[in-house]
């Protein structure tokens, strides 16, 4: 079965817009997010454009801050401090990667917890690992969990293999699965005999960024396969999974594009709504 992220993303956006419209009707205020882009990374620009269009569609105001790669860390930290103190800014979005002279961890950790719409602040990730209700999930892992829920896939007692151990996807999704009583194995580029691990997975999640890394012989019959990878090959987008062949064995599989990627912005919008309500004291 194809796991359609586009349809679910549309449904989520409709619900968010309805809630934003209702809050505006009652309180006469709209959410405001500040988005910061340093440098001219093409993938970041594409993601930013997708964000801004969604903000406009849902009635979310946006303050855009674009800087050259030469910007200093001190300047960026000073800007974030001002945005933290601005009561009319509900969320702060840092588009990664940042140039080498800027410590990304330091910058992300400088964002006020209530305004951390990306969920990358160390405090936020700590709350996630504790399964504390106060955490904000990073958007892509949240999208994966939304898809799993939509297709009624029970994680309890399942063997889940996550290929990719980044702070953005791999580690947070592993924590979310653990919180749902799944059994998680995390693999990375140093993992020996990767296929031996993946063939045991009831649910296989790949978030590496290597086209067709996951082949048919690496997948168990009837497994759920979730492809987070986005790779441009000969002008076309491909995932980490050899989709055409793996889909023959998988009970559920996400396409690229149209799977997890479609949900990343939708879940970011959900995080913005959450920060908006918390920042403005709206119950």
UniProtKB/Swiss-Prot annotation:
Disulfide bonds: none
Binding-site list for NADP(+): 164-166, 189, 230
Cited Pfam families: THF_DHG_CYH, THF_DHG_CYH_C
GO MF: methenyltetrahydrofolate cyclohydrolase activity; methylenetetrahydrofolate dehydrogenase (NADP+) activity
EC numbers, comma separated: 1.5.1.5, 3.5.4.9
Catalytic activity: (6R)-5,10-methylene-5,6,7,8-tetrahydrofolate + NADP(+) = (6R)-5,10-methenyltetrahydrofolate + NADPH; (6R)-5,10-methenyltetrahydrofolate + H2O = (6R)-10-formyltetrahydrofolate + H(+)
GO biological process: L-histidine biosynthetic process; methionine biosynthetic process; purine nucleotide biosynthetic process; tetrahydrofolate interconversion
Cellular-component GO terms for this entry: cytosol
Keyword hit for NADP: yes
Keyword field: Amino-acid biosynthesis, Histidine biosynthesis, Hydrolase, Methionine biosynthesis, Multifunctional enzyme, NADP, One-carbon metabolism, Oxidoreductase, Purine biosynthesis
Keyword set includes Hydrolase: yes
Pathway(s) it belongs to: One-carbon metabolism; tetrahydrofolate interconversion
PANTHER family: C-1-TETRAHYDROFOLATE SYNTHASE, CYTOPLASMIC, C-1-TETRAHYDROFOLATE SYNTHASE, CYTOPLASMIC-RELATED
Entry similarity comment: Belongs to the tetrahydrofolate dehydrogenase/cyclohydrolase family.
Known partners and oligomeric status: Homodimer.
Function: Catalyzes the oxidation of 5,10-methylenetetrahydrofolate to 5,10-methenyltetrahydrofolate and then the hydrolysis of 5,10-methenyltetrahydrofolate to 10-formyltetrahydrofolate.
Protein name stated in the entry: Bifunctional protein FolD
UniProt source species: Fusobacterium nucleatum subsp. nucleatum (strain ATCC 25586 / DSM 15643 / BCRC 10681 / CIP 101130 / JCM 8532 / KCTC 2640 / LMG 13131 / VPI 4355)
Classification of source organism: Bacteria, Fusobacteriati, Fusobacteriota, Fusobacteriia, Fusobacteriales
Name of the gene encoding the protein in the UniProt record: folD
């Amino acid at each position: 079965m194809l796991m359609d992220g586009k349809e679910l993303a549309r449904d989520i956006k409709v619900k968010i817009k309805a809630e934003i419209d209702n809050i505006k009707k009652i309180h006469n205020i709209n959410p405001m997010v500040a988005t910061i882009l340093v440098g001219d990374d093409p993938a970041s620009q594409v993601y930013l454009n997708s964000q801004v269009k969604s903000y406009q569609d849902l009635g979310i105001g946006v303050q855009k801050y674009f800087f050259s790669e030469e910007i200093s860390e001190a300047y960026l930290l000073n800007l974030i401090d001002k945005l933290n103190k601005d009561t009319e800014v509900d969320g702060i979005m840092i588009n990664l990667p940042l140039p080498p002279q800027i410590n990304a961890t330091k910058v992300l950790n400088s964002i006020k917890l209530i305004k951390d719409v990306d969920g990358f602040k160390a405090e936020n990730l700590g709350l996630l690992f504790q399964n504390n209700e106060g955490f904000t999930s990073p958007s892509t892992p949240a999208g994966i969990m939304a898809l799993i829920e939509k297709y009624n896939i029970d994680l309890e007692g399942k063997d889940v293999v996550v290929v990719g151990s980044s702070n953005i996807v791999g580690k947070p999704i592993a924590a979310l699965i653990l919180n749902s009583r799944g059994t998680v194995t995390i693999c990375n580029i140093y993992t020996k005999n990767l296929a031996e691990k993946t063939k045991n997975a009831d649910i296989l999640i790949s978030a590496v960024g290597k086209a067709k890394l996951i082949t048919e012989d690496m997948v168990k019959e009837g497994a759920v396969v979730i492809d987070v990878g986005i790779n441009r090959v000969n002008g076309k987008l491909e995932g980490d999974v050899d989709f055409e062949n793996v889909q023959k064995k998988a009970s559920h599989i996400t396409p690229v594009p149209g799977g997890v990627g479609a949900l990343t912005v939708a879940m970011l919008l959900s995080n913005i709504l959450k920060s908006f309500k918390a920042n403005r004291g709206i119950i």
